[in-house]
């Protein structure tokens, strides 16, 4: 079940409490999205995974707050806000823009000397070193943004039919695209933990851009393909969650076997 935490930590508006949890899974949304995109995940994940959807400023419960202007600022502030929650085993998942944020968080925690995630899941995103700077070119007006929403899929039809909902969606999407356009990759040392890429077969991200994530992984690297386009995580939700569950289960076993025996 969910416990609202918005008055304590605005980045984590709802926390999936499970007394049997062995690992926390922080989930970061795509451009234009919010924590609610993960609302159905809790009931489909096992009790040993505690789901922690991340809410970015300027949307849903944080609609009254100004949208972020810099990805690094988001990473730094979010990293600070979850420090008390990463002392226990955890993993990071991010889709599209959220994948960049999840990667940035893992790197930030490492640079701070803090615990590292057991695993990083990056979904529907080219590696930071291989992002296409032309992908978002021209997406700076309502007509272009609406066309992009329709092409990407994943936006409910009722959003297009409601002027109010559409306005909110376009404003958040435009702010997030500005955030992404300002992103510049600066080479970093590989991360020390496993990295798992999830991708849609019909997405327009070239496979070489996905495989380039391996350069970021100092630990094990894996890539899973799913039927569908950019929002395959909705079209194939059950398969995506089963993949995450299996990967985390194996990783917990590896870590427990590698831990020194108690004296």
Task: List PLM regions with ranges.
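Domain-scale detector for complete catalytic domains at protein termini or as standalone homologs
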Residues: 2-93, 100-263
């Amino acid at each position: 079940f969910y416990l609202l935490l918005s008055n304590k930590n605005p980045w984590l508006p709802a926390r999936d409490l499970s007394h049997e949890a062995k690992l926390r899974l922080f989930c970061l949304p795509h451009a234009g999205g919010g924590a609610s995109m993960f609302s159905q995940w809790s009931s489909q994940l096992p009790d040993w995974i505690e789901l922690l959807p991340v809410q970015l400023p300027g949307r849903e419960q944080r609609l009254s707050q100004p949208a972020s202007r810099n990805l690094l600022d988001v990473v730094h502030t979010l990293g600070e806000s979850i420090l008390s929650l990463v002392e226990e085993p955890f993993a990071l998942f991010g889709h599209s823009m959220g994948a960049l944020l999840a990667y940035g968080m893992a790197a930030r925690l490492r640079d701070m000397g803090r615990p590292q995630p057991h695993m990083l899941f990056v979904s529907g995103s080219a590696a930071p070193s291989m992002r296409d700077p032309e992908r978002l070119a021209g997406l700076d007006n309502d007509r272009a943004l609406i066309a992009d929403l329709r092409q990407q899929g994943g936006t409910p039809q009722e959003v297009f039919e409601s002027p109010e909902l559409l306005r909110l969606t376009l404003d958040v999407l435009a702010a997030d695209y500005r955030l992404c356009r300002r992103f510049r990759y600066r080479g970093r040392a590989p991360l020390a933990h496993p990295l798992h890429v999830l991708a849609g077969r019909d997405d327009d991200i070239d496979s070489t851009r996905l495989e380039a994530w391996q350069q970021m992984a100092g630990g094990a690297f894996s890539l899973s393909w799913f039927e569908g386009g950019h929002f395959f995580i909705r079209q194939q939700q059950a398969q995506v969650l089963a993949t995450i569950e299996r990967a985390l289960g194996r990783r917990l076993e590896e870590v427990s076997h590698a831990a020194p025996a108690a004296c």
